[in-house]
Curated annotation (Swiss-Prot):
Its main location: membrane. Belongs to the ATPase delta chain family. It comes from Haemophilus influenzae (strain PittEE). This is ATP synthase subunit delta. The keyword Lipoprotein does not apply. It comes from the Bacteria. Keywords: ATP synthesis, Cell inner membrane, Cell membrane, CF(1), Hydrogen ion transport, Ion transport, Membrane, Transport. GO terms for molecular function: proton-transporting ATP synthase activity, rotational mechanism. Gene3D superfamilies: N-terminal domain of the delta subunit of the F1F0-ATP synthase (1.10.520.20). F(1)F(0) ATP synthase produces ATP from ADP in the presence of a proton or sodium gradient. F-type ATPases consist of two structural domains, F(1) containing the extramembraneous catalytic core and F(0) containing the membrane proton channel, linked together by a central stalk and a peripheral stalk. During catalysis, ATP synthesis in the catalytic domain of F(1) is coupled via a rotary mechanism of the central stalk subunits to proton translocation. This protein is part of the stalk that links CF(0) to CF(1). It either transmits conformational changes from CF(0) to CF(1) or is implicated in proton conduction. GO terms for cellular component: plasma membrane; proton-transporting ATP synthase complex. It is found in: Cell inner membrane.
Amino acid sequence: MSELTTIARPYAKAAFDFAIEQSAVEKWTEMLGFAAAVAEDETVKAYLSSSLSAQKLADTVISICGEQLDQYGQNLIRLMAENKRLSAIPAVFEEFKHHVEEHQAIAEVEVTSAQPLNATQIEKIAAAMEKRLARKVKLNCNVDNALIAGVIIRTEDFVIDGSSRGQLTRLANELQL
């Protein structure tokens, strides 16, 4: 776990709890997503690492975000600036999204395949994973030619390696025993 994730966790939890309380999860997702995009800009990153006052840094981020931040979003930016944590805004957004997915019972599943998957294959994998996990899934599909053939499916809890590379590795391990 990275240091930024550790720093971001309490801010994300507080923002999520407040968003739930205010029935504004979608609004907060948009606000934090926009603020994270701003904070990830190279020029803004350099500015945030300067030795300017917290007030000046917060005012700058708030003015760049403009109307994308409501007063509560602005308060979060000010609080993070006072604590010298503005560089953690993208990590706060990522942690916030994890809270939202958990709240909505959505599991993130990473699917790595040797070749690009077609829509039918993606639907079948999604249906199988939803059945196995008993919750909705969000698939993130990647291509890795080194797999030779097949797929590797990763969730937070387990990995299913159905790739040719994985089968060859297991076979090699068996032969060495």
